[in-house]
Amino acid sequence: MTPPLGDIAHVGHAQLFTPDLDASVAFFTDYLGLTVNGQDGDTVYLRTYDDYEHHSLVLTARERPGLGRLALRTSSEEALQRRVAALEAAGRSGKWVEDEPGIGRLYLTADPDGHEHALYWESEHYQAPDELRPALKNQPQARPNRGVGVRRLDHVNFLAADVLANAEFQEQLLGARPTEQIRLDSGKIAARWLTFTDKSYDVVYTEDWTGSSGRLHHIAFAADTREDILRAADLAIDTGVFIETGPHKHAIQQ
């Protein structure tokens, strides 16, 4: 049975593992313009300026880089319970934890590829300190005066050994809708873009050519304009940030 639309309200935050925590924090604050909003041991919580929640990104020190969890906020407590019931009825294992500041209990599970997902409802609204208080009341935080100044976390692109199985997990158990895909001449689905909202996409699965499971392709942050993207490229060149590809856009959804 297809889940009701709207049980997943939006992408909440993502967690990345890093072998150099200080350098990673510097990249996200100095270059992208995120703000540190707390630290607990080897874990740092950062936020984009237009996020109403406590954090948008979690950086945790680990020996090897990688993806931790993707957190998805539900539209209500009832929606959270519906998704948990659907996951358990489908045989997906999970557990409840309460281990993040500003967030209530989270239900941890994983897609078929092993990417950890956290579903939650309870969330504290961010209250900016005086030095970050915005002039506009409907803006959670003043726009940063450094770096790119990205507005919000936009989407996560997972690498997957089996794109179709993982995409169907999102569709059948979490309520995502496909908006774009790459189908090879053989009929195999090599990539699929999915959304929980009215955006083009929130979650993407791309075939991992190595056949590995549980890896990350990229996370993406939203800027306001095309000019912001070009400015980000200029800042990358000026500050020594490596540009792997682009700027470019998708052929279909752009």
What positions do the PLM features span?
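N-terminal beta-strand motif that seeds the catalytic metal site of vicinal oxygen chelate
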Residues: 1-22, 67-70, 131-164, 177, ...
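Active-site/pore-lining binding-face segments in mid-to-C-terminal subdomains
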Residues: 210, 216-254
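Core segments of cupin and vicinal oxygen chelate
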Residues: 6, 15-53, 158-201, 234
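Short, charged/polar, Gly/Pro-enriched secondary-structure boundary elements
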Residues: 51-57, 114-117, 126-127, 200-203
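A short beta-turn/loop motif at secondary-structure boundaries
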Residues: 62, 99-102, 184-186, 209-211, ...
